[in-house]
Amino acid sequence: MLFRSIETISSWLRYKEPLLLFHNNGRTFDDVTTLGGPAFTLGYPARGLAVGDLDNDGRPDVVIANNGGAPLVLHNTLHNANHWIGLNLLGNAVGANITWSVGGVKHGLFHRGGGSYLSSSDPRDILGLGPSASADWIQVQWPAGAGRTDRFEHVAGGRYYSLAPGSKLK
């Protein structure tokens, strides 16, 4: 097969490529692949990636689709003192603006859909709380179709909530 012999055609193309891991510093990225563990020392025919909290612990895990092979699951086992809140927005929520406050500091993100090539990531959003066990408030500004904003005060962390436009956190 051509794709398995690509190395004989090109000196720089590879069928199996190494996984890469970067740390976001806000404005630049540092290559931290060497800190990623044994999975990052091998080559894979990786062609898709999905991110999701597979065990509902608030830490995102990664599933990598390998062309013609078994998927690779990178289970996030990092333990730290930080807290989180998970939101499962129901209905047509792509584009919703989620804002929250922790200790008087405002944070925000846009709810996205989709994922990577032939992959779809977990639709739930994880809101970071740092050392605080709860959010001062959470606000969801729904996309134009719903045309509303929902706000919730003093939301406890460490769990997932479901929310539809105009409803209570469940």
Show which residues each predicted segment covers.
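Short, small-residue-biased leader/transition segments that mark boundaries at the very start
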Residues: 1-2
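Acidic, low-complexity, intrinsically disordered peripheral segments
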Residues: 7-8
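Gly/Ser/Thr/Pro-enriched helix-cap/hinge segments flanking short amphipathic alpha-helices
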Residues: 11-170
